[in-house]
Structure formats: structure tokens, C-alpha cells
Amino acid sequence: MLKIFICEDNKDQRQSIERIVKNYLMMVDLDARLELSTDLPNDILKWRTQEQHDYLFLLDIELNHEMNGIILASQLRESYPHAKIVFITSHTEMAFLSFA
């Protein structure tokens, strides 16, 4: 099963991403679910499981928090080395940070 996580501090953006993910999952035959959608990076870091799954993290780069999406991704990578991480931003100048 693919477990999907969203971390976006803008409520409207987060709800839009949730709708896109849920609509896509309804259209395709994929063993996946939206596990958690939050504005707090620590909510994602607290979530732990011993079960083996595939993980997809959709992370805003610039969060209204002491931890940004890049730092969150590096911490997630330690626990989930094979997870897929997608950075989301509406700031074009921030987009290149994900390739550093």
C-alpha cells in the first residue's frame, strides 16, 4: 500500500492538494490512501509505523514553522530512505532549493 502525506501550511492550498489526491485515487486502481494531511511538520515526524509500505510525502518548501520542507524531508529520509518526496511551492524562487 502507498501511504500519502501532505504538509502544507496554507489551508486553502492544503485542501486543494487533498482534493487532487483523493480525486486521483478514485480514478485509478491503486492500493493507496491519504494517510495524513497537516500544516505541522512535527505531525508527520510523530507518525511512525513498523509496517512496510511505500510512502509519498508532498511537502511545502516554505512552512510557517521553525522547520521548512527541506529540513523536514532530510529528517524523513532518515526514517524512510526509499520514500518518494515531492516539494510543492508557489514561490518560483524557492523551486530551485529542492535541487540543491
Question: What residue spans do the PLM features occupy?
Answer:
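Conserved acidic carboxylate
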Residues: 8
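A generic structural motif
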Residues: 25-36, 53, 81-83
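Acidic, metal-coordinating helix/loop segments flanking the phosphotransfer/catalytic sites
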Residues: 15-18, 33-56
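Non-catalytic signal-transmission and effector/linker regions of two-component phosphorelay proteins
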Residues: 1-5, 15-18
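A structural signal for isolated positions on well-ordered beta-strands in alpha/beta enzyme cores
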Residues: 3-5, 33-35, 86
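CheY-like receiver
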Residues: 54-100
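Short catalytic helix/loop segments, enriched in acidic residues and glycine
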Residues: 21
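Charged phosphotransfer/docking patches of two-component systems
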Residues: 11-18, 95
